[in-house]
């Protein structure tokens, strides 16, 4: 049997006797994907589809975890960025996005506290409204159906891991087994990055405030302890003085009673007045005046007064 001439475009079979379209050719394709890639001039079916890069395509909206749910609020810093970004872009159309963000960050740091508070207040109002809407949404039937669907997707993902691997090896997309459609992949959109930076800045600000408050609290605690010690010391001194005052009052009362009893037998010369507890001071003044007017005449009275005073002093002083 005569063989026809070989076709000009026919390729030689690889070692092992298998054609490229058979299993051996598939192994070669896998090795090329794992290695450095095909040589120059070689084209495979996988070159028709570009290699996927990490991250999320620019401009593509992030998939919502809860469909039809309330939109999450942004911080005051992000509100400021969203308001000022277009103005900066209009004035500087050739300025790249990182430079715009840097300029806005510097502008935010120099912003007056009253202006900052306006954005923070708006963000707080939006946050309160979001929490209210979220609580209402979590009670709805749509939320329950969504959570059930997410749970089913997780179970389906675990069961379809082998099918996903086969799809990747065959070099084409799987409509239902694509990893990006199964997982909620975090994306780095403009809004996401701005919100992340704003949260980090807010955390740094709160940490600084926390440190300042802790220092103030420590100072106030020291002042409080000092004031408490001073108050306790003053209370002790006051109690001591009150005891001393009470003792002196008791001693004074005893002396007045002893003087009243002792001078009861010595009437004032010329008037015959004798002392009582209520009139003791007046009596002693009258007696002193009478003795000063004529000391020589009242020498015996003076001697008696000295004896009484010495006796009272020895008993009560």
From Swiss-Prot:
Q: Where is the composition biased (Low complexity)?
A: 1-17
Phosphoserine: residues carrying this PTM:
160
Q: Locations of Basic and acidic residues compositional bias? A: 31-52
Coiled-coil-forming residues are 190-257
Annotated Gene Ontology cellular components are: chromosome; nuclear body; nucleoplasm; nucleus
State the InterPro entries in the record: ChromReg_NeuronalGeneExpr, HMG_box_dom, HMG_box_dom_sf
Q: In which tissues is it expressed?
A: Ubiquitously expressed in adult tissues.
Listed GO MF terms: DNA binding
A Pfam family hit: HMG_box
Q: Which GO terms describe its biological process?
A: chromatin organization; negative regulation of protein sumoylation; positive regulation of neuron differentiation; protein sumoylation; regulation of gene expression; skeletal muscle cell differentiation
Q: What is the effect of changing residue 116 to I?
A: Loss of DNA binding activity of the BHC histone deacetylase complex
Q: Where is this cross-link: Glycyl lysine isopeptide (Lys-Gly) (interchain with G-Cter in SUMO2)?
A: 31
Please describe what this protein does.
Answer: Required for correct progression through G2 phase of the cell cycle and entry into mitosis. Required for RCOR1/CoREST mediated repression of neuronal specific gene promoters.
Quote the PANTHER family the UniProt record gives. HIGH MOBILITY GROUP PROTEIN 2, SWI_SNF-RELATED MATRIX-ASSOCIATED ACTIN-DEPENDENT REGULATOR OF CHROMATIN SUBFAMILY E MEMBER 1-RELATED
Query: Subunit comment for this entry?
Result: Component of a BHC histone deacetylase complex that contains HDAC1, HDAC2, HMG20B/BRAF35, KDM1A, RCOR1/CoREST and PHF21A/BHC80. The BHC complex may also contain ZMYM2, ZNF217, ZMYM3, GSE1 and GTF2I. Interacts with the BRCA2 tumor suppressor protein. Interacts with DTNB.
Protein's UniProt name: SWI/SNF-related matrix-associated actin-dependent regulator of chromatin subfamily E member 1-related
Organism, by scientific name, is Homo sapiens
